[in-house]
Amino acid sequence: MNEFPLHQLANIDVQYEDNHVIVAVKPPNMLSQADKTGDTDILTQLKEYIKIKYNKPGAVYLGLVHRLDRPVGGLMVFARTSKAASRLSAQMREHEMGREYLCVVEGRVKDRFTCIDYLKKNEYLNKVEICDADEKGAQLAMLSGECLARKNGTALCAIRLQTG
């Protein structure tokens, strides 16, 4: 018996699919993968989608190549084979696959900008926080951005991550 009825999978927006990869839209506030909360995640939903669409018995392999934070919506790439997972993961490591975001921010923003900070995970709050470079667990985080439009004290920015 399938874990999810088909009507619950209808909100899965698959943008591209072949024998090696599947690209789908992760809605904002959905997890990328299962966690201890038990909340809905796109990885589990897509495995069920593949199981139903292709009438696959048993467990379905789907490799998680990257994640998006829970509040973030956008395209995610998943590997349908272990070989594709290995190759896509290597592309992510070598920065051959870009990670770009659009965001709306308040306040003044330069036309082009770079942010360099150090981040560490707060396990208790399950969030990442800015910290000093010498703090235990600190990791370098760099991004560049460009302001695309301004209106009423807000700015639409295109962001490109240089680091994970």
Predicted regions mapped to residue ranges:
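RNA pseudouridine synthases
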Residues: M1-T163
